[in-house]
Amino acid sequence: MFFKQYSAKESTLSYFLGCGTLGKAVAVDVVAGDEQWFIDRAAEAQVTITHVIDTHVHADHYSGGRKLAQLASAHYCLHESNAELVKFPFHPLHDNDTIEAGNVIIKVLHTPGHTMDSVCLLVTDKRRGEQPWFVITGDTLFVGAIGRPDLAGREQAMAAMLFDSIHSKLLSLPDEVEIFPGHQAGSVCGAGLSGKPSSTIGFEKRFNPGLKVTNKNEFVKLLTGEIPPRPAEMDRMVAANIAA
């Protein structure tokens, strides 16, 4: 298995992973303008990009996911709930779907709360073992912070949904599972993000302020009480990311 984390604009973290042995690769949360980086890495590794995934429709940056998918003749993937929102065809992701990139297995976890369409990606390398190795958490869970719940409006209800998603889908994973988030410090997609670009489930359980709160009502109060300003061009970015 190969795995690369790419630090992009707006404190965004993108990912490129796959199986060099069988020549398959997946790109995650590609920022517009970075498409060639993924094309070049695929050429260097002599792999074919089969899937390009956005963990949700982004509101803080312009996505390069669909363009990369077109350049690579790959599937462009979003959660199925976007079927009536986006204005173009895409490969729908469903909860518990699996994507095989050679010996690398990616399991889709639907984790609504930051947005209704948010997904996390649980990754297993079959050559390493049958247990999951790490999870790409998008804007659901950050190092030291939780994703903001207000970008779709209804922040109280979305924060409660985020609590359920995190506790049922992520905190049930083994403590040693690594997490790779969609952003690091400097992003407006959460409050109090660490500059460290990775962590583990166990470490976040111990030290992430949002995960220390185990009562849902208290979690909602905490999360809605410290919401950063909305992204300056949010409406324009969302419109561009769903446009035909």
Labelled PLM ranges:
Residues M1-T48, L121-G138, G144:
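Conserved beta-strand hairpin/beta-sheet module of binuclear metal-dependent hydrolase folds
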Residues R128-G129, W133-F134, G144, Q156-A244:
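Divalent-metal (often Zn2+) His-rich catalytic cores of metallo-beta-lactamase-fold enzymes
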Residues N82, F88-I146:
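Active-site-adjacent scaffolding segments
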Residues A27-V30, T48-H58, C77-E80, H110-G113, ...:
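Active-site neighborhood of phospho(di)ester-bond hydrolases with catalytic His/Asp-centered motifs
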Residues D34-C77:
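Active-site metal-binding motif and surrounding structural segment of the metallo-beta-lactamase
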Residues P149-Q156:
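Short glycine-enriched, charge-decorated loop/helix-capping segments at active-site entrances
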Residues L17, D29, H56, L68, ...:
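Divalent metal-coordination and catalytic microenvironments
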Residues D34, V57-Y62, A83-V86, M116-D117, ...:
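Active-site environment of divalent metal-dependent phosphoester hydrolases
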